[in-house]
């Protein structure tokens, strides 16, 4: 009887894991929307095949972002940074963490947060939970966790935040994006080292991407250009 019960638990766990993976794959490959931007590493990857993937869709006041990573073990953070240029100084950082022992899956506000990067040194604003508790969202990004999924070595996070603070800070709506990964240490972000990449520019204003002809070839080209819009190396 115990063996049957144990096998049933294993089956349910496997089904849950597969459903989570399928959900992430659906989200991350939904890049045909004229307003949605997607990038991934390595070049040519799609969805959960990527080592690192990011998407953004904006309505002009808020943007919804997705961050996905493979080979993500315990005590790891994934992040994207918004910057006015490729130097990646004076930029906003939105991060998502995997801390199996230090976080509670029932409290999603522990899983993500904000930091501010000066000259390549992160100043922690805090997790969403701490920001709300301490009322220290000084830039008014109003970050919110929408979905959080983790598997044996994968991490998927969907978040939303206001875009006005970023646009006002840089005085532009089109900003450079950095994707990075590092070790979560003592409640903070360790330096990412070489595990980073400048992936291009996104428009936070919510304006449509350049429209192509309404054809199967055009649609496939749009997916290809959206997913592979990046240029350099990222080491994992």
Swiss-Prot record:
It comes from the Eukaryota. Glycans are attached at residues 59, 171, 197. Residues 1-24 form the signal peptide. GO terms for cellular component: extracellular region. Its main location: secreted. CDD domains: DOMON_SDR_2_like. It is found in: Secreted. Keywords: Glycoprotein, Secreted, Signal. This is Uncharacterized protein C44B7.5.
């Amino acid at each position: 009887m115990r063996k049957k019960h144990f096998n049933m638990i294993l089956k349910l766990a496997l089904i849950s894991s597969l459903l989570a993976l399928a959900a992430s794959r659906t989200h991350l490959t939904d890049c045909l929307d004229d307003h949605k931007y997607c990038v991934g590493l390595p070049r040519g990857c799609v969805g959960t095949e990527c080592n690192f993937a990011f998407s953004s869709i904006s309505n002009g006041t808020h943007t919804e972002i997705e961050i996905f990573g493979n080979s993500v073990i315990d005590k790891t953070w994934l992040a994207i940074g918004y910057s006015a240029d490729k130097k990646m100084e004076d930029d906003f950082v939105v991060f998502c963490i995997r801390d199996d022992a230090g976080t509670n899956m029932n409290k999603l506000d522990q899983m993500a947060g904000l930091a501010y990067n000066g000259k390549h040194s992160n100043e922690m604003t805090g997790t969403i939970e701490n920001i709300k508790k301490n009322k220290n969202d000084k830039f008014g990004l109003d970050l919110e966790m929408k979905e959080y999924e983790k598997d044996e070595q994968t991490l998927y996070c969907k978040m939303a935040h206001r875009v006005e603070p970023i646009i006002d800070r840089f005085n532009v709506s089109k900003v450079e994006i950095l994707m990075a990964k590092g070790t979560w240490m003592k409640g903070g972000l360790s330096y990412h080292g070489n595990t980073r990449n400048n992936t291009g520019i996104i428009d936070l204003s919510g304006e449509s991407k350049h429209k192509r002809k309404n054809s199967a070839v055009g649609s496939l080209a749009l997916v290809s250009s959206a997913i592979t819009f990046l240029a350099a190396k990222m080491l994992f």
